[in-house]
Regions:
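The right-handed parallel beta-helix/beta-solenoid scaffold, focusing on the short coil/turn
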Residues: 12, 49-51, 58, 64, ...
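Extracellular beta-rich repeat passengers
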Residues: 132, 136-138, 292, 544, ...
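Right-handed parallel beta-helix
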Residues: 277-288, 324-329, 348-362, 379-397, ...
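Short glycine/acidic-rich loop motifs that flank beta-strands on beta-rich extracellular proteins
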Residues: 64-65, 263, 290-296, 339, ...
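Extracellular polysaccharide-degrading/modifying enzymes targeting complex plant/algal/animal polysaccharides
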Residues: 15-346, 351-358, 372-380, 408-414, ...
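Secretory targeting and sorting signals
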Residues: 1-11
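The substrate-binding groove and active-site-proximal loops of carbohydrate-active enzymes
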Residues: 331-343, 366-379, 405-416, 434, ...
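Extracellular beta-strand solenoid repeats
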Residues: 54, 61, 67, 81-83, ...
Length: 649
């Protein structure tokens, strides 16, 4: 895909190429990304026009993430633009190409290649797709859990006692709305001893590893002995050997294999006093990361759409908190967020356009997340941030996560922390959640003024889009339900509103979602959101799950002129403990499923003019919504997996 040249030339162009050296940064002698950054810093004190960092075609493999601060920003109202050269498709990757394959096991068709010893990764990208880490699916009923781990029956599972590298093995439990990872310590005597604190953290709260609300697939993963299906891989970092069992038709002499080295690619952010600002990225592919957090003894104790529990906590007895307890509420205010591959915080006037975010080992883009999710150490504080005309696809977790989940996100101690004025438009977001299934395409938690419009979302394991967070517990006056749970023993019961207001989902085409998880829908909401608008969206095929889902604490939403086709219940509310819910205006929507528990007059709701459509007889208004939803014609088309693979440089 070629990207158009700008209408007018900028005052100064810094030229970059994958093989660039030196500091000239000229068209004749282009430089590296790092040298280009230094050149910009020598030019941007008093800009009279934009500075363009022009990336030539090819694959850039930086040794470390690109870190942009106030020193790298525009000035005088002008912008520093990092963009593709005309007709170029530059790729910035955190991975290394793996070549030199040879047969390791002829009978099993397992191949191997040398990689640097000590290099670890949770993902491998083969021909532009996320390959499957070696695993075996097991029956939950064959395991009995205790505070130390799991006992299993003998017989067919006896081989587990003899697995090599046992401390690298993980248990994955795909549940209702959480997808959890817990690492093994050792195996012997038909007992799997689990690493702490991951085991405890994964078994307390709700939808837990061993007591899920819905028991989905249960895996043991990351052992060479599990390498038995085409498309699987295993990495031995001690020996520096990568193993792969090719898919049918894959030729290991020509296949593209990318092994991630970096955990993130770009970090844009300064401080609240000196934020990064006036930066644009255009026409660039960002790819090739692997977030290693779940590989530690913390595992990944998934809680809700990319928020997870870590750390050591004073839990009660093992069997006493599988469906919530007071001690779990002590941990809730301290949940963490998955760090994204591209991070923006303490920044304003930042744009990503005409770009691709593919083959990433975590959430693709994090905007104003909590401090712990940013390598800068400064979270939140994102304003006037735009992601447009781009593709986010074929990655391990979610698409775009805007906002934090901790106290400074919803009741900031410094007003400069407020996330505001975020635009996410005309993007195609699809085929996500390869490794972390409890995610969505776009989530705005605590944000003031966001517009998520004209995007296409599809092939998602969980909900399509989500607004809000906190289950109403952090909203003004709090929640009696969470008071009874004991939450306010550990955090304030706030009397003032959160920062969430005036957030809009408009004109999006969301289809083929909820493909693997439960307890979600096409559009999902949590918490209060004054002046929130959900309008003119087209929801199609939710695998029998909800169309519009008002979950706990949802309040002050307006939903009108949306189309819900081939969904389960078209509009539902989870009133469990929901005394602070309602005040919704749900009008003039069309659906093929007439069932709903959202009624007019209840809890201050206005529900009117909604139409159940049969036999495909869509009224003209609904047809107009369906025709206009999704990206405009100027949005670049989605790519196939092979199209994003770059040549070795």
């Amino acid at each position: 895909m070629a990207f158009p040249a700008p209408a007018s030339a900028a005052a100064h162009t810094v030229y970059v190429s994958p093989s660039g050296t030196g500091t000239d940064c000229s068209s004749a002698q282009p430089c590296s990304l790092a040298a280009a950054q230094a050149e910009v810093r020598s030019l941007n004190d008093a800009m009279s026009d934009d500075i363009v960092v022009q990336l030539a075609d090819g694959v850039y493999r930086p040794a470390q993430p690109l870190r942009l601060t106030a020193e790298d920003s525009g000035s005088g109202g002008h912008t520093v633009v990092w963009r593709a050269a005309p007709s170029a498709r530059p790729v910035i990757t955190g991975a290394r190409a793996v070549t030199g394959w040879s047969v390791s096991d002829t009978g099993k068709n397992i191949w191997k290649a040398d990689v640097p010893a000590g290099l670890d990764a949770r993902q491998l990208y083969v021909d532009g797709a996320v390959a499957t880490r070696a695993r075996t699916q097991v029956n939950r009923a064959d395991f009995t859990a205790s505070s130390a781990g799991m006992r299993f029956s003998g017989g067919a599972l006896s081989y587990l006692n003899n697995l090599a590298d046992q401390s690298r093995i993980e248990v994955e439990s795909v549940n209702s709305f959480t997808d959890r990872y817990s690492p093994v310590q050792s195996i012997g005597g038909n007992f799997i001893t689990m690493q702490q604190p991951a085991w405890n953290n994964n078994n307390f709260g709700y939808d837990t590893l061993m007591r899920p609300h819905r028991a989905g697939p249960f895996y043991l993963s990351n052992a060479y002995e599990f390498l038995d299906s085409p498309g699987e891989w295993y990495l031995n970092p001690t020996a520096g050997t990568l193993y792969y069992k090719p898919l049918a038709g894959q030729n290991m002499s020509s296949v593209s294999v990318e092994l991630p080295r970096l955990q993130s690619l770009v970090n844009v952010g300064g401080t609240y006093g000196e934020p990064a600002h006036h930066l644009t990225f255009s026409g660039i592919t960002f790819t090739g990361t692997s977030w290693l957090g779940p590989s530690s003894n913390q595992g990944y104790a998934d809680q809700q759409t990319g928020a997870y529990l870590a750390g050591d906590w004073n839990w009660p007895s093992f069997d006493s908190c599988h469906n919530g307890c007071t001690q779990f509420e002590a941990a809730r205010p301290h949940w963490r967020q998955m760090p994204a591959a591209v991070q923006v915080s303490a920044a304003h006037t930042i744009t990503f356009t005409d770009s691709r975010f593919v083959n990433l080992g975590q959430t693709a883009i994090g905007i104003g997340n909590d401090a712990g999710a940013h390598t800068s150490g400064v979270g939140l504080g994102a304003a006037d941030i735009t992601v447009t005309r781009s593709e986010i696809a074929r990655s391990s977790a979610g698409g775009i996560l805007v906002g934090g989940v901790r106290a400074d996100a919803h009741h900031p101690s410094d007003q400069r922390m407020v996330n505001r004025d975020i635009t996410i438009s005309n993007n195609r977001i699809h085929d996500l959640g390869a490794d972390h299934r409890g995610i969505v395409s776009v989530l705005t938690t605590y944000v003031t003024n966001s517009t998520v419009a004209q995007n296409e979302v599809y092939n998602m394991p969980y909900s399509g889009m989500s607004i809000g967070f906190g289950w109403g517990a952090n909203d003004a006056g709090g929640s009696n339900h969470y008071a009874n749970r004991g939450l306010y023993n550990y955090q304030p019961r706030y009397t003032t509103p959160t920062t969430a207001s005036n957030n809009r989902l408009v004109g999006n085409y969301i289809h083929d979602v909820m493909q693997q998880m439960n307890d979600g829908g096409c559009i999902y909401t949590l918490g209060w959101n004054p002046s929130a608008l959900i309008s003119r969206n087209h929801c199609l095929r939710t695998n029998g799950h909800f169309g519009l889902y008002f979950d706990e604490g949802s309040k002050y939403y307006k939903a009108d002129n949306n189309v819900f086709s081939n969904t389960g219940t078209w509009a539902t509310a989870n009133y469990w403990g929901g005394e602070n819910m309602g005040s919704w205006t749900v009008t003039n929507n069309w659906s093929t499923n007439g069932s709903t528990n959202v009624t007019n007059g209840d809890r201050g709701n206005v529900v009117a003019g909604n139409v159940t459509v049969t036999n495909g007889n869509w009224p003209s208004g609904a047809q107009d919504v369906m025709a206009s939803a999704g990206p405009k014609d100027t949005t670049p088309p989605p790519t196939t997996a092979r199209q994003i693979v770059g040549a070795q440089s």
